[in-house]
Each structure stands twice: as C-alpha cells, then as structure tokens.
C-alpha cells in the first residue's frame, strides 16, 4: 500500500508538472474531442443558372481580405517584403486597374472587430464588438501580468462571443437584389447560435469559425514552418489550431493543400458556379497571420532571402498574391471582370509579434495599436465598368465604408433603422474635382481611444493619461506629438470634444476585457530595449 501511495504521488507530481508547463494545450484537446477533424471531403457548391438571362444585372462583388498584412508587405507602394524582392503583381493590379485610396483605415487594430465593421458598416464599438473573442486560457498565456483574472470568473462561454444576430450584415442586405453570397476562409465573428456565416446572411460557407487555422499539417513534407519561440501567441496557436475547415454547418475536415491555395481554388469554383447570377464572394484569407507556414515551392523560390522567418513570411505573401491572381483570372475567363467590384484590404496592420521590423514601414506601430502601422492599410477598389484605371483618392476612408459602397453599387438602399457610420466612397472618389471626405473616424479598446478627422489624429490613453496629437497631413508617420505645446491647443480641444461625443454614442462591450497590457509602438517584441520606450495599453 505504501509503495502504491508513493507511486501515486510521483505520478501526480509528474502530472502536475506537465500541466503547469503545457496547460495551454487544453483548449485544443477539448476542441479535438468535441469537434473532431475528418479526412478531406469534396465540396459541392450550389450552382446558378446554366445560362445568363441576358438582362442587365447588378455587379458581382468580391471582397478580398488579407490577415495581418503589413502596409509594406506588397510592392505597390514601391516597398515590399524582403526589400521589395517579392513582387505582388496581382494585388497591385487591383489598384492599378481601379482606385487606390492613399489613406485607407481598418475597423480596428485587431482581427475580429475589423471584420464586424467590414460587414455591418458600423464602428465595431457601436456594435459592442470592442474586443477580439478570446478564451481565458489564451488571455492568461499572452497577457502575463496584464491578465485580469477577476473578469474571467463570469466570462461568457466561447459560443456566446460574436456578432449579434440583430446586426444587419452586407450579405443580408444584398439578398434584396437576389445576390448569392458565399464566405470563404476566416470568420472570427462567432460560432454560437445565430452567429455563424449561414445565420448571418451567407448562403454558403467554407472555412473556419475561430480566428485561425493551420495552413498545413506541421509535419507535411510540402510545408516549411517558422516558429516564433519568443511569442506567447505563436506558442498558443501551434498548440491549439487545427488544419481544418467546415462546409456550411457540417463537421470539420482537412483541406487538400496549403490553406491559401485551397481557398483560392475554391473561390475560382464559386465564381464558375455563379457566373450567370449576381454573387457576393467574401474571400477572407488567413495569410500572412501566424503560425507562419509556407508552401515549400514558394519557400524554395526565395533562396535569396537569408533570414528563415522573413523567407517563410515572404513565401506566404507570394502564395497569397498567386491565389488572388487566380481569382482575378477566373473573373476574366468567364467574362465577368468588367462588371465585378473587387475590393482588397487587410483586417489590420502587420504584427510586432512576428519579429520582422519593416512590415508596416514607413509607419510606426503594429497590429494591437492604433498608430498608423496598426490601422493604415492597403485599400483598393476595381470596377472597370465604372472606375477608370489608375485613380487615386486621398481623404481618409475606412472599413466601415465598404458596406455602404457595395450596397450603392448593387442598388440597395441603406437601412434606416440604425446608424451606419460608413459612406459610399465612390460618390466622392469618382467626382471631378474630388470633394474631401471630412467626417470623423473613431476607434476604441478600453481606455485607449482615437479620433481622426481631416488629417488630424488624436490618441488618448486614459489608463496613464497619455495624449498624442498628430497632423498627418504634414507628419504621416506620427513623429511629432503636437499635444505637448500650446500652439495647437485649440485643435486639441476640438478633437477631444469630437472624440468624447463619439465615445458617448458607443455601446458597452458585449463581454469584458481579460487583458490590459503594454504594447511597444516602435519595437518588435523580440527586440525590446532595456531603456524606456513608448507604449500604449491594449485592452482585450
């Protein structure tokens, strides 16, 4: 008996040690049991009419959203990843053959709230979607001392975190004109009752409900992996994400290739099957978000890049651009290019936790900040039937505008029972001369609040009473904080009043924050200096 008890104690001690080291694997283990991943299965899309009716029809709409794409990841702005040595001709072509908006802004500095703004035309905080859905396990791992344990006590279960069904989404509105709407890829707006894509207006969905998925299985011979051991987010993703998609509300199964290629091929099929009716395709890639996994052929093609992480990341950009080229090619081959609105953007800026310093160059800040690096994004619209090639518009536009712009193109009136924060940007950009767009844009996460109007940007950090005022018209990279002197006190007072007025209109968060952590503005998380550096406090 004594030996048995000693053995039991040893087993318990070993088990306790292992749990203390690897407890963050628990969500993935539970998910694998409750929602197992099957082998690959074919996908049968609904088919539209065999022939076109010949009647005039509203334009198709293709909304392409990259995930954590840095402003400097593409070569359109004469930069690009790896010193511009990885061309992005397909992405660039959307801008070159249409309009590029020099001051495009995301809905938020993180993934999910931006997507809420994209699909509702409302500030994410007006919806109450202030924070990216997170489990307490994730928050505890990534936040460290910034973890708010008391808020985890009554924290809602994961299936209650998402976009409320009472919100009107873009596909729901487009249904008024007979659009067939398909969502591909990353959803991140909830997986509970009333929150899935097919319950939020999409006719069909193929992708993953949470905020990420593996691009391939880690041990696949055709994948190259790059793990960021210094990053707790990366550690959590490798431990818990699955290489899996689901079709509509079915069970999860494995794709048959690298996720980016898989989504691109499925998008081509959707275009083919719906070529004879108006369709809305929401193509939400998860590239180049971590975990960094590149297709081996793309990695091998970039032998000139010495750094393994940068090479893997660049290979993911290469695959993303190739996939977008295939989608554009499908539109062309079916004679749909002229009357298809193609919109390209990213959900937020590049992430400092990747460890690559130039992702958002020339801007300061990262994903998880409201500095320009976190929210200033590529924003392109192509519609050959209506938009002359090579256009440019310089006033600030944002993700909330995509809702209104797409509905105007489709001939659908905006809902009248709620505030819509976005506008039809083509109404401004296609005039000659182009009128400025002067309305304020607003962002908030906890006590970190920002307003932008007419090129003037005010950032307030209430937790530590910080203020930043920038004139982006003269200082687009936010180098000179004008709040520190008296010269711009009038502008500061005006913007502060605008910020507080907008802040008062926003909803209470749908769930509490679990994180309040300092985020470095100018350094990647693996290169934090020993001396003082500028931070913001991010709530989530």
Tell me the role of every PLM-derived stretch:
Residues 47, 180, 187-188, 250-256, ...:
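C-terminal accessory region downstream of the catalytic core in glycan-modifying enzymes
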Residues 204, 208-216, 350-372, 387-391, ...:
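C-terminal cap/loop subdomain of S1 sulfatases and analogous C-terminal strand-loop tails that border
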Residues 71-169, 173, 200-204, 214:
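Active-site segment of extracytoplasmic enzymes that catalyze sulfate/phosphate-ester chemistry
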